[in-house]
Design a protein with these regions (language model features):
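Catalytic cysteine-centered active-site loop
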Residues: 40-44, 63-115, 169
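Aromatic- and glycine-rich peptidoglycan recognition patches
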Residues: 19-45, 107-108, 128-129, 134-180
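Positively charged n-region of N-terminal signal peptides that target proteins for export
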Residues: 1-4
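N-terminal signal peptide c-region/cleavage motif recognized by signal peptidases
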Residues: 13-15
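Extracytoplasmic/secreted envelope proteins and their assembly/folding machinery
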Residues: 50-54, 58, 78-82, 113, ...
């Protein structure tokens, strides 16, 4: 009985503290979710970060790579970016090929990258062959052929070597290309 009373008091105390925190910050659940996602994803999230984006990423982390895949059983890099754009931003990229998407985006310098921008990589034959979505702090999420959906750093030697460019979704350009 003592243990039960102690547990009830502890729970009551936690609820009161949570209410106080919610009243002072106004965003208890948002703050809690942000903290959870930071731990889950292993990256710091800015207070202005898109929680839907990070929540969606957390459900896909570890999904195996599968060429031309676009579901939780297996997904490729362009399929994954298309899923993120559809579910998070409500936008259709209109292409399932990283090289085609690269042609359509508004080109950016690396220092102009913002959360949600696209990063592109070349293969050894100098062709655009891989795409990821930029998160901030040099981190990006992508479907790696060897490790599935992961978060990587643009400063890792491999990605530094094969980085081809960056771009931003531009609805009017993508829309024009989709109508052809």
């Amino acid at each position: 009985m003592r243990i039960l009373s102690f547990m009830a008091m502890l729970l009551w105390s936690l609820c009161l503290n949570a209410q106080d925190s919610a009243l002072t910050s106004g965003n208890f659940l948002t703050d809690y979710k942000r903290s959870y996602l930071e731990q889950e994803l292993g990256i710091p999230l800015s207070t202005g970060g898109n929680l839907l984006l990070y929540d969606t990423i957390s459900t896909w982390l570890g999904t195996p790579y599968r060429f031309a895949g676009n579901c939780e059983k297996g997904i490729d890099c362009s399929g994954f970016v298309n899923v993120l754009f559809d579910r998070v931003y409500g936008k259709k990229l209109g292409a399932r090929n990283s090289a085609v998407i690269y042609v359509w985006v508004l080109k950016l310098n690396k220092d102009e990258l913002q959360e949600g921008d696209l990063v592109f990589f070349r293969n050894s034959r100098k062709r655009i062959s891989h795409i990821g979505l930029y998160l901030g702090n040099n981190k990006f999420v992508h479907a790696s052929t060897s490790r599935g959906v992961i978060i990587s750093d643009l400063n890792e030697p491999y990605y530094k070597r094969y980085f081809a460019g960056a771009g931003r979704y531009k609805a009017d350009v993508i829309g024009e290309n989709n109508s052809n």
